[in-house]
Amino acid sequence: SRVLKGGNGNVDPLADTYLGPILRVKPGQKVRVRFKNQLPRESVIHWHGLHISPKMDGHPMYAIERGEQFVYEFTVNNRPGTYWFHPHPDQITGPQVYSGLAGMFIVEGEYPDLPTGEYDMPLILQDRQFDANNQLVYPDDRMARMRGFLGDRLLVNGRPEGQTPVNKATYRFRVLNGSNSRIYKLAWSDGSD
C-alpha cells in the first residue's frame, strides 16, 4: 500500500504495525482517497461517523471488486473529534478489520484547553489470537460469526505489550475500540481518577 500525502501533517503512519495510518483533517477540508482493491475478495471503505453522501460512505452495496478501484471524494462536514475508517463488505467486514484494514480519522479543531502534539495520543485497542508461527488466527466458524470471539492477546496501536514513556503532564487519549467483540473497561493501574 502507498499513502500519498496531500499536505504536510495530514497522514501519521503508526510505525511497526499492520494498522492503517491516522488521517488528520480539518472541518471543511476536501478529502480524496483512491482505493485500489488488491484483496482476494471485494471490499469498501466505510468512514465511520462522518457526514458524507451514501455513495462515498462505504455501504456494502458499493463494494469494490478485486482488481477494481474507486475514488472517495468528500468534504469534511463533521465537528472536531475522533472517527475511524474500516472496510464494510457484506459478511466479511470482521475478517478484514481483524487483519488490520482500519485506522483513525481525526478531525482537528481549535480547542486551546486540550493537549496537542506529543500529548495528543491515539490508542487503538484490539484483541487478537496468534498461532504458533505468530500469525493472526481468525476463527471463521458459524458461532464466531454469530457471537463474535475474544482474542487472547491485547494489542495497542497494533503492537503487543507496548509501553510508552510519558512526561508528568496532561495528555489527551483518543481511544478506539478496534476489537471485533470485546468491550473494554479502562482504568488507571493505581486506582486514581
Residue ranges with predicted function:
Residues 1-193:
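Histidine-centered copper-binding motifs that mark active-site loops
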